[in-house]
Structures are given as C-alpha cells and as structure tokens.
C-alpha cells in the first residue's frame, strides 16, 4: 500500500499501478458512497470521510475491481463502513494532540477531535451524529531549486524555482528592446546593447502566498428506520465537510474553505439494496498560488522610463503580458544604461533587475496583503487566481442476491448510474456557456460456486458492462479460483484473472486551465471547440505578414503542434528537419488485464503470511503530454511554423 502525502490533511492511497497525488485510479467508498470531489475526481484526503470514533470496518482490495465496482476501480478500492446506531449507541469521543516538526515550519501543535453519538429510540428507529475537527500547521514547501534541473539559483537571469512563484513569467529581453525601439520608446540602436537572454520576473516564496493552516471540519448525521421485524432498513445519511489544505497539481493550490456535502437515501435487506446519493462541492476561497504571485507582480507601479504609455499598448505589440511588460521594459532600460556606463554584462543584469524591482510590491507590507486579497478573490486569471466551482455528481446503485431462490450457487446482479454536472464558470473546465452534463451506466453479475469436499475449492466468476455516453461500451470479466488446504482450512491458495477500466476523468475530457507557461486542455471534441484564446504576435511575426494577434482553439494542440523534445533538438542545432508533429491522440478508456497468484495462511497462533505475485498489462493509458503549438503556419510546412 502506497500513501502519498500531499499535505498534512491530504494523503492519497494507492495499491497497484501508477498514481499521483490526484489518484483517479483508486476508489474509496464510505458506506457505499464515492467520496471523490466532483471537480477533482479524487478524494480530498479525509475531508468527507469518517471520524475515527464511527469506524466499523475498513477493507482494502488491491488490484482491478471493475467487474463489481465499475469504472475507476482500476488500481484498487477501499471499502469503509460506519457504525449503525441500532447496534452501536451512546456517546463516545477521542482527542489527540501532538507536535509537527519541520525545519522550515518549526514546531507546531496538532489537534484532532472526534465525537460520536448514537441513539436507538426503539427497534424501529435510531439516529446518529458525528463531528470531527482537526487543526495544525501544514508542511511548508520552500525549495528554491530550478524546476527544470538546470542548476540555476535565484541569482540567475532565468531562474524558475520549484517553490518560487511568479518567476514563471519570462521573455527574451532582446525582443523587448526591439519592440521598444519600434514603438519609439527607446532610441534606435539600443537593441544592439541587449543580449538575446531569457529573463524571468522576480518571484515570491510560498510562505508569502499562504498561511499554511491545515484545518478540517466535518459532520455527518443519519436516520435509520426498520418498519418490520427483520433487517429491512430505510435510511437517510447526510455528510458535510470543509477545510483548508495545500494541493500539489500542475501548479500549487491553496485549498481554503473548500466544502463538500453528500446526501444519501438507501433501502436494503439481506438480499438487496438500492441507494441513491448526490455529492456536491464548492471551491470556496481556493486559489492558484502561481497565478496569485503572477498577478501580484502585475500590480507594478508606474515607471518613469515610459511616461504616457500603457501596458496594454505594449502587450498589443508582443510583450509578454499586460502588466508584466513595463517591468521588462524597465529591465532593458536599466541594463542599457548600465552598459553605457561601462558595467559588465553581469553588472548590467543586476542593474536592470534592481531598476525593475523598484516598483514591485514587497511581501509582508499592508499594500501587499491588500493586493493579495484582491487577486485571490478574482476568478479572471489575467488579474486574479480564484477558483470557482459548484459541481455535482448524482449516483445510484442497486444489487440483488438470489440466495433465497438459488441454493446451488451464490448469484447476484446489480447496476449503477451516474450523472455529472460540472459547473466551474470556465475557471477549471470549458463550461463557459453553462454546466457540462453527461452520464454513464453499468450492469453486472457475479456467480460464486463451491466444489469438492467441504467446498474447499471456490470458483468466482463476474462480468460487467459499462457505457459512458462519449465512448463505446466496456465489458470487464473476472474469474478466480481459491483452494483452502489444511485440516483447519488455514492455508488459502488463489489464482485469478481480472480486468479493469477507467473512463477518462472529467478533467481528461473538459479541462481548460491556464497554468502559466502552458494550458491544460481536455480532449472532448466540444471542449476543444470551446477553448478559444487570442495571442499577440511579435513584430518579427507581423513582418512576415501575420496579423498582430491570432486566435487558437483546443484543436490546435492536438492537430497542429510539435513535440517538446523535437523543439528542444531544433533549438540546440537549428536544424528544422528535427521538428516532429506531436501526434497526440484523443483519450480513450484505460484498460488493464491482470493475472494474480497468491497465498494466505496462518502458520501459528501468532504468525500469518499473505503474499501475491501479479502482472498488469495496460492499454490506452492516459497521461498529460506537453506540446508546442505555433502561432502561425502548419506543422510540417517547413516554413512559417518553423519561424514561429
């Protein structure tokens, strides 16, 4: 079992196969409900999980479990069940306190409180309620190492630190000088003093962008009704959780006041269950730390170098971005002035940065805090960093066991239905015109049959059919044999073949997210058409007859792009023959086929062994692929696209 620690309150569980913090290939069910956040496609730690005082059982099933549990039970599944108030009554609680210690964060108090109350009014009616609260200080990420492994430090011109934010914004200062000369804002010939050198903006540390508070508040409640004198039960369960944490995805995100809720109705007996529930999330005050720093940097004071010129005018002429351009212009002017004064190139760079940084907002000041709050409350990524999301999942499951009708085997059938409603107002998904809705459904059956004396040999066979409205149907069979040896059946040998699949996640299909130096684009055809952006063309490009701006949509990334590796080879050699089309394909459902051989045995009263050997074979594996799309020309034309 792998546990990836993203932050103090956010741990991602995985068993077999590939995973990141955003583990969309592992399912966690709490009393039959998937506790994944609709916007993220994975559980946000234990935000909506159980309190420790209400845990009845936890079962971990490694490997593909799609035959019974459907899409995404790919690497494994964690089944968690809470205590029923008919069986567990009374008031109980738990309090834990300790210290977290880190060189960057120091020593900080950690507190964790859980309270449970259950009451049985009669043999027909029972209720319960739970409350949990956790408070601590999150781990501080403070690495200044260059994220591209170039060995650069903050003293270098193009440093992009792992936990320095805002320095993602960079440009070639020679191009800046040429633009300024072309606009008449700098004397002709000044561009000859400026080297072709990429320079990045001065960034902010993570401690300047978040307070690193780790907090979780959650509550759940349930009403359970048994109208007859048997195990027939009708129940309603509600769950609510909110908290603050840090999430590491493509960028670094401050998750603040993120809220999730679930509401479930279930009817069950010994032979069947029918449940339906809704999961809803709200991004609260969550924000992107990278864009927070980028847009704080854009609150740059007026420059004496360019009186009467607006940053929008500079942006229209090809400088990096509205709000950054004056900084780079000031850098160039400071560099040129120092060079004319006899400075070395290194001294001129220092003079240029010093001149440009004279106008930045200093962390820790009241002005900085005011601007930061303005940025993190604005969802427009050109000047803000706030996430907006209020997505929902509607889900239903049913199952029937024929144990009262069939005595020669254990046979059950079941099915599920899920409806997605994605609503990020265009800040995460390409839902610019309203919520994105789509559905998937599935049915399954399983047979378990015992053979030989005392039914020591057991055959289990299952099959499931699932259909997502964007893809062809998937059939996932599973078959296994287990044999119990020994006088007391204390040696279990098992052999199994199973299949699993994972439908592309909501982000795989519909994401349309700006992450600074790149754009994340999902591969749904509708998403590709909806993702449309305008980009300024440099003066060199305009000299080739290209307009001052171009419009690209998501299709460009898939159908007109170069592979990053080939562009790197071209940049190093200047040989355009090395450029290659990216060849990126649309996502399809992932599939895995697994063969497993295992043994579990109790060798003595105090010693037991559980071991397994397995092999997984994957197809249609989904991953993020970086590509470079030219602003003009067609990939393979050997002309404009190369110049771009």
State the predicted function of each range:
Residues 1-34, 56-57:
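Extracytoplasmic beta-strand/coil segments of soluble accessory domains associated
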Residues 11-17, 26-29, 43-48, 60, ...:
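N-terminal periplasmic accessory domains that precede
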Residues 17, 115-119, 219-225, 263-269, ...:
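Residues on the lipid-exposed face of transmembrane beta-strands in outer-membrane beta-barrel proteins
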Residues 34-62:
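Short acidic/polar hinge/loop motifs at secondary-structure boundaries
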Residues 94-256:
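Periplasmic-side early beta-strands and strand-to-turn transitions of outer-membrane beta-barrels
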Residues 97-101, 133-137, 227, 238-244, ...:
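Transmembrane beta-strands of outer-membrane beta-barrel pores
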Residues 264-471:
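Face-selective signature of the C-terminal outer-membrane beta-barrel domain
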Residues 526-643:
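Membrane-embedded beta-barrel scaffold of Gram-negative outer-membrane proteins
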